[in-house]
């Protein structure tokens, strides 16, 4: 298994799909990384040479991924909480932040739902 950005990349998957195992890299960014590294998208990770894996590491290193990205997101939410702005209040109250309706939906954000509503009475 290749190790990129502190994550073991599954070597039985295609390069584009395998890179999405890294937090912060989706399919579009993965395609851009493969194109910049000069790697075909349909090549599996185990078929790559060590030089190609090093190129992938260099390209992934240009982005904020994994722990750094998680830390950045957490700090952004903490900043909103400290400011006391509307979005910060919504985070504090565990309500939807981006204007979604709460009269009917948003149950997963409002309360932890372990079972569906219909199975409660049974």
Swiss-Prot record:
**Which HAMAP family would you find in this protein's record?**
Ribosomal_uS13
Molecular function (GO) terms for this protein are: rRNA binding; structural constituent of ribosome; tRNA binding
Natural source organism: Haemophilus influenzae (strain ATCC 51907 / DSM 11121 / KW20 / Rd)
Q: Where is this region: Disordered?
A: 94-122
For this protein, the record's InterPro entries field holds: Rbsml_uS13_C, Ribosomal_uS13, Ribosomal_uS13-like_H2TH, Ribosomal_uS13_bac-type, Ribosomal_uS13_CS
Q: So what family is this one in?
A: Belongs to the universal ribosomal protein uS13 family.
Taxonomic superkingdom: Bacteria
What keywords are assigned to this protein?
Ribonucleoprotein, Ribosomal protein, RNA-binding, rRNA-binding, tRNA-binding
Q: Name one GO cellular component term.
A: small ribosomal subunit
Sum up the protein's function in the record's words: Located at the top of the head of the 30S subunit, it contacts several helices of the 16S rRNA. In the 70S ribosome it contacts the 23S rRNA (bridge B1a) and protein L5 of the 50S subunit (bridge B1b), connecting the 2 subunits; these bridges are implicated in subunit movement. Contacts the tRNAs in the A and P-sites.
Give GO BP annotations, semicolon-separated: translation
Record protein name field = Small ribosomal subunit protein uS13
Assembly and interaction partners: Part of the 30S ribosomal subunit. Forms a loose heterodimer with protein S19. Forms two bridges to the 50S subunit in the 70S ribosome.
């Amino acid at each position: 298994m290749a190790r990129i950005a502190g994550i073991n990349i599954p070597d039985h998957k295609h390069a584009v799909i395998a890179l999405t195992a890294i937090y912060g890299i989706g399919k579009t960014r993965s395609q851009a990384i493969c194109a910049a590294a000069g790697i075909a998208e349909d090549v599996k990770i185990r078929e790559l040479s060590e030089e190609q894996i090093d190129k992938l590491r260099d390209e992934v290193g240009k982005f904020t991924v994994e722990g750094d990205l998680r830390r950045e997101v957490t700090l952004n939410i903490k900043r909103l909480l400290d400011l006391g702005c509307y979005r910060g209040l919504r985070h504090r109250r565990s309500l939807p932040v981006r204007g979604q309706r709460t009269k009917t939906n948003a149950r997963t954000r409002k309360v932890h739902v372990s079972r569906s509503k219909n199975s409660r009475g049974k």
